[in-house]
Amino acid sequence: LAGSVFLVNLISHLLKEETMHIKKCFTAIFISSAFLSAGLVNSHAAEAPVQQQKVAKPNVVILATGGTIAGSAASNTQMTGYKAGALGIDVLLQAVPEIHKVANVKGEQISNIGSESMNNKIWLKLAKRINELLAKPDVDGIVITHGTDTLEETAYFLNLVTKSDKPVVIIGAMRPATAISADGPVNILNAVNLAASKDAKGRGVLIAMNDNINGARDVQKTNTLRVDTFQSPELGYLGYFENGRPVFYKATTRKHTIDTEFDVSNLNDLPRVDIIYSHVNDDGRMAEAAVANGAKGIVHAGTGNGSIHEAAEPALYDAAKKGIVVVRSARVPNGPTIESTAAWDKAGFVHAGTLNPQKARILLQLGLTKTNDPQKISEMFKQY
């Protein structure tokens, strides 16, 4: 009996040992399989090609208004006497396929006129469309094609009423699109580069012509024919283009775009403001005519530092007494118009600072949508 018990215990012990051995074997096999599987997965991951993530191109909208940049002439050597605003936006874009490498570009036709005929209606239509587009998250910048005659005025108007810090770039051309060395295509390419650039954000409305970058407030058309006509003689360029890449060296310090108080969203027209150009033998009759024809403001383009002919003073004093705001500017191209005689200050005449007459007129127009108080208007001229 004792032998039988011993035999049973021995067999039981051997079975337990075998079971433990089998468990260890299965554990080892499981762990090995896990490592092998991991190795295979890692091996496949290492062998898989690395896919580079595509960087989305910016979205730029080009708004066309006409001008020489869309002009057409009888021959490719004709640089004057052409028809401005003859070509549509689609034709302009087809001439510069390189822009599509820079951004996703769409075009819209706002108008197609020579810019000498620009008016308040088109200005307001353009401004409202710009604000509508820039409010969309998928629009990164705007380019406006425009005639050069009033380009500086449209640029400054938009600089005061655009409600976004996204880039807005305005361009034109001094030679028609049909010219043998038309300057429009490179201006379009540079403008798209600028509108697509994050460096252009928050700088106000910019002008991109002849490889230079000007600010809307200070830019002037300085020559009737040359392609380098747009300059900022008093305060200089903001930057330039280097192989299409915008390079900035300066920034404007006056308020613009999102920092202004002006809102044109509900406006259908702008107050009438006339410019009176002073000259020898000025007798004030032009100022009287402006008042008689409903002007709400007068910009006096005076001689020297905004000087007023003594024979014209009574007409301007009378206008001010009637609640018409009078701004003194200068017909001299450079230099500020500053405070002068006590009589002019007492009459409430506002001085334009470094704004030329045509830009002083724009600021006065917008100022009059808020107030006709000369003191408040004067503060605007110090800020903008």
Named regions from a protein language model:
Residues 47-132, 314:
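ATP/NTP phosphate-donor binding region
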Residues 57, 63, 67-70, 88, ...:
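Accessory alpha-helical/coil subdomains and C-terminal extensions
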Residues 171-242:
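Internal gly/pro-rich beta-alpha loop/helix module
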Residues 305-384:
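C-terminal non-catalytic interaction/assembly regions of soluble proteins
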